[in-house]
């Protein structure tokens, strides 16, 4: 079975740095945190949430001294006592820089346990952590009550998730079992439903297939674009212009009636860069009056660097996998409906819930 876990308590969404690399700070007042950051946790706790993962943050309004994961004020007093959460409290990884480089005093794993955490995730050195916790317990630095509370909650979570009846997974044909036609059909549908138009001036999309139209394609980013390009060419001839140097590229664009630009960024890791380069932004700025359709195969936040005035159409495909490249090409030529809804705010011109519906062409 599975246990539903919310993260990262008390709220990691409005930070500018990554706790894998440093210690982020939240400077909001206690009142603001209570009204905004804590709201989703309160609602989930009302519905018997199984677990909560803590955040590695500096939050002076809640605790001037301790990192939030190591803070008794934040974990025990706020989460467990004030919010009445009695589920499993799990630390974020304890080998992250926010803990390794910024924790002070006693061993952080001991401090985390005493703060009210039940499960210590990924200590930097497990053997050392075990020995330090055992030593602290013998010296009464960790109480019997705190240790037993954590153990009982862990055993309860294991029982609830069915680990008492665990059976070895049969690995024969496991790849085939996990990759069935019904799964690919669902992925195809999810990709199709998610393609989002955030701009479509003069009903530029869907493209009309015509011998009078000439279409050029420019690919930006560090990842493959071939599926997108191949699918575009299934509908009409599309020339790939990237072999030209930038000056020649800008000149060549003028000979086409439509230009498609694709930002293809690798999504192999959530920490990969998703932004346009400065050079790519400059190219877009110079050619954006040439009937441009911009397709984002990356996080929609990449649009924050782009001035959208002058660009005719913008599609957000969210990731650069083959199925999303295929669906984006189909959307451009009207083979599918476009009805996705933007889940985040980019700026005032592209707010959350932006959704321009584009009907597919009638066959």
Model-derived features with residue positions:
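Second-shell residues forming the walls of enzyme active-site clefts
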Residues: 1-146, 153
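Preference for extracellular/luminal or secreted protein segments
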Residues: 81, 103-363
């Amino acid at each position: 079975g599975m246990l539903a876990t919310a993260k990262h308590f008390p709220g990691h969404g409005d930070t500018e740095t990554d706790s894998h690399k440093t210690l982020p700070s939240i400077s909001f007042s206690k009142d603001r945190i209570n009204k905004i950051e804590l709201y989703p946790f309160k609602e989930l706790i009302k519905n018997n949430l199984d677990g909560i993962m803590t955040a590695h943050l500096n939050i002076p309004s809640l605790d001037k001294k301790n990192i939030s994961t190591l803070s008794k004020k934040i974990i025990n007093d706020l989460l467990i006592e004030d919010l009445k959460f009695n589920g499993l409290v799990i630390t974020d990884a304890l080998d992250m820089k926010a803990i390794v480089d910024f924790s002070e005093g006693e061993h952080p794993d001991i401090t985390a346990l005493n703060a009210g955490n039940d499960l210590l995730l990924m200590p930097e050195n497990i053997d050392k952590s075990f020995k330090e916790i055992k030593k602290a317990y013998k010296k009464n630095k960790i109480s019997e009550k705190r240790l037993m509370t954590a153990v009982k909650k862990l055993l309860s979570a294991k029982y609830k998730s069915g680990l008492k009846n665990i059976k070895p997974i049969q690995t024969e044909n496991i790849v085939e079992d996990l990759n069935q036609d019904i799964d690919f059909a669902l992925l195809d549908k999810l990709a199709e439903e998610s393609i989002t138009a955030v701009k479509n001036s003069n009903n530029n999309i869907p493209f009309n297939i015509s011998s009078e139209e000439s279409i050029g394609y420019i690919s930006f980013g560090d990842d493959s674009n071939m599926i997108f390009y191949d699918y575009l060419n299934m509908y009409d001839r599309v020339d790939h212009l990237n072999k030209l140097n930038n000056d020649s590229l800008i000149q060549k664009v003028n000979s086409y009636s439509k230009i498609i630009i694709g930002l293809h960024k690798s999504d192999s890791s959530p920490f990969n860069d998703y932004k346009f380069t400065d050079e790519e932004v400059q190219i877009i700025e110079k050619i954006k009056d040439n009937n441009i359709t911009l397709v984002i195969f990356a996080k929609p936040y990449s649009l924050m660097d782009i001035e959208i005035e002058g660009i005719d159409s913008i599609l957000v495909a969210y990731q650069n996998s083959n199925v999303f490249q295929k669906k984006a090409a189909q959307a451009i030529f009207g083979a599918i409906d476009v009805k996705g809804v933007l889940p985040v705010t980019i700026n005032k011109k592209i707010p959350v819930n932006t959704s321009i519906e584009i009907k597919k062409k009638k066959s």
